Design a protein with these regions (language model features):
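Extended C-terminal subregions enriched in glycine
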Residues: 254-273
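Active-site microenvironments that recognize anionic phosphate/pyrophosphate groups
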Residues: 1-164, 170-244, 250, 264, ...
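Acidic/histidine-rich, metal-coordinating catalytic segments
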Residues: 278-282
Length: 340
């Protein structure tokens, strides 16, 4: 780019959604007298008798967890969606509601209560990825299921109700809002260029390098040019794939390595168990031609300056558009310097 974006307030385009984010680099050092988060760095026990997710323990619904050794997947005891929910369309003037069906599952990443993905070896994370593949396939093949959302909320600041290492998988009959936006923008670009938009974006990022944190043979880990959250990151395959089912065993291992490298760098940044929400966006499962899709995994961590100061999405960001202080380039440099 011809302009040094570090010196000016500006906005950046998210090519996947068509939305803009305001960037204000000169605000990064403004004084802070607002809310500070508590830091909980104490080590948890490997097994917690009161935890509903630990191996062998009884969940709130009375069912006993198996004494699992690595991965454990079960149907959520308090699901947001129900498979047998009646389909309907209700319309009264401008008031409209539609029935939504789905299945929600919980995936425990490890039997060890004290761990997170950052504490796990790539071979262990690879088992998590393989479980994601199985669930995406199994749920996506069901009648009435058109999208499968894999995600993780880590840390109480992100609303996680249990510190045991786990994620969730929600499958549903329609496409969620964020997926609709990404589907439309990827499709438009593919129709015009016969290539995926993320494929072309990665080529450009590999030339500039300034936002890349890590890369291996098959994946790039970077701070997206349009990042909203201070240390937001994205893991993207270098070659276009519609979904994680296209990953070979070797590529699963490389994906696991990328997750391990990023989450470990996060924990080193402020010397804490770094909170975030992460999720995989991939092709819908309804049987359409999805050649325009290029799957990717995003991480949205809230911490801004330290383990106790987080970003708040309030004010202008609620009523105008997202805004960030530190640039994506600065964030990438900070994380890259922490990778061994």
């Amino acid at each position: 780019m011809n302009t040094d974006l570090q010196d000016y307030s500006h906005k950046r385009l998210n090519i996947l959604t068509g939305e803009w984010v305001m960037v204000s680099p000169f605000r990064a050092n403004r004084p802070w007298q607002g809310k500070s988060e508590a830091v909980t760095n104490g080590r948890r026990p490997a097994h917690d008798e009161s935890c509903y997710l630990c191996a062998g323990n009884t969940r709130i619904n009375g069912e006993q967890n198996p004494k699992y050794k690595d991965i454990f997947v079960f149907t959520n005891d308090f699901p947001a969606l129900q498979k047998d929910s009646a389909p309907f369309i209700s319309k009264d003037g401008l008031l409209e509601a539609q029935g939504e069906q789905g299945i929600c599952k919980v995936i425990c990443f490890s039997p060890y209560h004290s761990r997170s993905l950052a504490d796990m070896q790539p071979i262990e994370i690879g088992k998590v990825v393989s479980a994601w593949q199985r669930e995406y396939k199994e749920l996506g093949d069901m009648d009435g299921i058109n999208y499968v959302q894999i995600f993780e909320n880590k840390g109480s600041v992100m609303g996680c109700s249990n510190p045991h290492p786990h994620g969730q998988i929600w499958s549903q009959s329609s496409l969620p809002n964020e997926v609709i936006k990404k589907d439309q923008h990827q499709l438009q670009y593919f129709k015009e260029n016969s290539r995926t938009i993320l494929g072309d974006y990665i080529v450009q990022e590999l030339v500039h390098k300034e936002r890349i944190i890590f890369e291996n043979h098959f994946f790039v880990v970077l701070i997206p040019f349009w990042a909203i959250w201070p240390f937001e990151a994205m893991i993207v395959p270098k070659i276009a794939q519609k979904d994680i089912l296209e990953l070979s065993d070797f590529e699963v291992a490389l994906f696991a390595e990328a997750i391990a490298v990023l989450t470990q760098a996060y924990d080193k940044l402020f010397n804490c168990s770094f909170p975030y929400s992460s999720g995989i966006h991939q092709a819908p499962t309804g049987g359409e031609n999805n050649d325009h899709w290029h799957w990717h995994m995003s991480f949205y961590p809230p911490l801004l300056r330290s383990a106790t100061v987080k970003k708040f999405m309030v004010g202008y960001e609620m009523f105008g558009s997202p805004q960030r202080d530190i640039t994506a380039e600065y964030a990438a440099t900070q994380l890259k310097n922490l990778i061994d």
